[in-house]
Amino acid sequence: AHTSLWHTAWVDENDEYDPTRKPDGNAIKGIEDTMELLRDYKSLDDSTVVVSIKYLVHLVGDMHCPTHVKYPGIKGFNIYVDGRKLNYHGVWDSYVLDCSVRWSGMEFQHILDRCTKREIKAITAGSVRDWFHDCAVYCRQIYVLAQPDQQFKSPDVWEDFLNPALPI
């Protein structure tokens, strides 16, 4: 499908979005194209609107996974937790979530619904590219916290590796 390229996006050496890498598709282009499509949502059929909103939710989530931000010269690698080999991408895509607090949909809604108008305005300020730059700057730290084939043991994995990356 045309969306298979939409799960990651590249930055340059200054952590700015690099549209020249994967110009036929990446998460930022996917978000921008979908937002543009939805500007005229009233003229679209309901199924197109629903699928487009699902894409946005998914892609914004992907961009909050540090390994979905692609940096020049940084490649994927493995680490070990309690002797178990973990792909670094998988650590941030699922391991952290599997080991973290799990909220129900209602609990998550309660947390989000407590934002003030001022907080909502701050959260939604700027463009997609501004937000991606901020995300890229912040997410870069994960490549300092672990090196290829590094060994971690529980519960030290949280103190030495995962907690310093919070609130990613």
Q: Where are the predicted features?
A:
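N-terminal, motif-rich segments that launch catalysis or mediate targeting to/interaction with membranes
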Residues: 1-59, 66-168
